[in-house]
Amino acid sequence: MEEHQVYLELDRSRQQDFLYPLVFREYIYGLAYGHDLNRSIFAENVGYDNKSSLLIVKRLITRMYQQNHLIISANDSKKNTFLRYNNNIYSQIISEGFAVVVEIPFSLQLSSSLEEAEILKSYNNLQSIHSIFPFFEDKFTYLNYLSDIRIPYPIHLEILVQILRYWVKDVPFFHLLRLFLYDYCNSNSLITPKKWISTFSKSNPRFFFFLYNFYVCEYESIFYFLRNKSSHLRLKSFSVFFERIFFYAKRKHLVEVVAKDFLSTLTFFKDPFIHYVRYQGKSILASKNAPLLMNKWKYYFIHLWQCHFDLWAQPGTIHINLLSEHSFHFLGYFLNVRLNRSVVRSQMLQNAFLIEMVIKKLDIIVPIIPLIRSLAKANFCNGLGNPISKPVWADSSDFDIIDRFLRICRNLSHYYNGSSKKKSLYRIKYILRLSCIKTLACKHKSTVRAFLKRLGSEKLLEEFFIEEQEIVSLIFPRASXTLQRLHRNRIWYLDILFFSNDLVNHE
């Protein structure tokens, strides 16, 4: 956000109306590609000097206007491979510039709205990510029904452009945006829409994330409007940003986080009748009342998608399930409400009778199969969960190899410490421990049995067997038995997001 304000040097009132000239600014593409703004990325690729970069951008857009949009036949496709390759480069460059330019008015609108509402000075509408699971523990035990709805996508390109025009009043810019989207769609017209979205998200991730999250924000704004019209009760809305672990840092960098990536934002609201959570392309509705209210909101969603966004959604694809019988995936867990039944014998005078009590408890399950798939993708095991060596790490020292495996193992244990059943984590520890041993044996060109026999299996990797309560006793040597007993039950650690970074960084 600060970089945009420094390099644009435009008045805030004019930035919303004149975006088209920004497409021809070189520093826009420097911001998009992360290059040094004093160097020309076009000069590096094409061979021109810095003064020619503006002409190259104009030339790219001119070629898009003059390009023939007819489908190339199969015989001509081999002859025009160089032209199609250049067109992919042009669309890639311009899409990166679009992603930066189109984020500017929305980030400025967000910052101005926050300043007017003085949200940054209050703690009511901004909560830490660590309050999500206590919220589920307190609220979901009193709820009965849940609907896990997949937000339909992709949306038609023309509808998406028309929605954007409500926010940005720049006709030339949207002519160019429409031309670019249809140009990219026509160049990939031989594949299905789902595969087109997949290729577009991989080749233009920043632009795709913006378009998708803008569509989600538009859909949720209408959904909030319908909710406010249907109920006179006050709505409490919260937003959680995953990029910042500490609460004060998130308050400080609120505008910057939203301007960069909307996809990592989780939004939810609650009222006495219905709870709504949107996470990873899904809308989760939960209610305590009978399914009548859930059915009403289900048809609200269907008519909203069909009438406003021209997206076909059938009522049979949206299911309303009991929380006690259905679990849903959220933040790496499987969550449902478990019913604990107990029978109490009561006696009054000479009459004795039995009382059946039902206690609801939030059951948080470790998804063992998705975890094994993630470990298999990171080459710690095969698809069946059998540990394998990681030859990529064989060049490191023994201490670094053990430290990497221990970091992943401990962070997984920390993250899933709040789960109800921790026995499934023993298999994950076994996979990581044996994968570490096989990696060390591969490095020393020995078998696993000979390597353990030479170094001693008891002293090697003994850190894998240190339980969480032992770690607490090491950190707090004077901890009482009450603290250790609480630790055995359920504790949500403050570093619950670190393990995913380790898995990604050490692949």
From Swiss-Prot:
GO terms for biological process: mRNA processing; RNA splicing; tRNA processing. Keywords: Chloroplast, mRNA processing, Plastid, RNA-binding, tRNA processing. Pfam families: Intron_maturas2, MatK_N. InterPro entries: Domain_X (IPR024937), Maturase_MatK (IPR002866), Maturase_MatK_N (IPR024942). GO terms for molecular function: RNA binding. The keyword Iron does not apply. GO terms for cellular component: chloroplast. It is found in: Plastid, Chloroplast. It comes from the Eukaryota. Its main location: plastid. Usually encoded in the trnK tRNA gene intron. Probably assists in splicing its own and other chloroplast group II introns. Belongs to the intron maturase 2 family. MatK subfamily. This is Maturase K. It comes from Robinia pseudoacacia.
